[in-house]
Amino acid sequence: MNRTLRRWCLSGLISLTLFAPVPAVYAASIEAGFSPEGSALQLVLNTIVTAQQSIRLMGYSFTSPEVTRALIQAKQRGIDVRVLLDWKTNSAKGSAGVAAMNLLANAGIPVRTVSQFKIMHDKVIITDGRNVETGSFNYSRAAANSNSENALVIRDYPALADTYLKHWQSRWEMGRDWSVSY
């Protein structure tokens, strides 16, 4: 009887193992791009365009018309977009940074600036709580066309994205809402 009981238990365990639901496992992928060759900007834009739920951007210099346009289009697609930028680099009256922030704010995208640090030098985009774009690439024309820069996208790595989201949130809480100025 003991032997029969063991067989039944073993059969039951094997059945449970074979037919138990398997959690989805994602294999992270990594892609690098460089400028001024153009692949860094394309990676940044692709990160924004492929977002399905949320985009959290934090940046130092923000003057890129292409990135500004892509973020506005994402907002128009229903994506939850929020942008956090260094105050000193982007707030000079009449600057391209002010123009870009005004465009975002007028499109209904919450924009905040941070001034508590000598510079807020982060350059990162987190999308859908699982993808991270980071590197030296500023979201600017100079980064795309003149500077030697790099961008790295790590896709399908929720634990890494969560680490970056916590950092982003800590800076967001320090930030001040951008008021549109003309």
Identify the function of each model-found stretch:
Residues 1-4:
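N-terminal secretory signal peptides that target proteins for export/translocation
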Residues 9-21:
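Bacterial N-terminal signal peptides
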Residues 31, 56-59, 82-85, 112-113, ...:
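Structural recognition of the beta-strand scaffold that forms the well-ordered cores
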Residues 22-27:
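Sec/Tat signal peptide C-region and signal peptidase I cleavage site
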Residues 46-109:
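Primarily the HKD phosphodiesterase
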Residues 36, 59-63, 85-89, 115, ...:
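A mature extracytoplasmic/lumenal domain signature
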Residues 42, 120, 127, 131-182:
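Signature of lipid phosphatidyltransferase scaffolds
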Residues 64-69, 90-99, 120-123, 134-135, ...:
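Extracytoplasmic/secreted cell-surface and envelope-processing proteins
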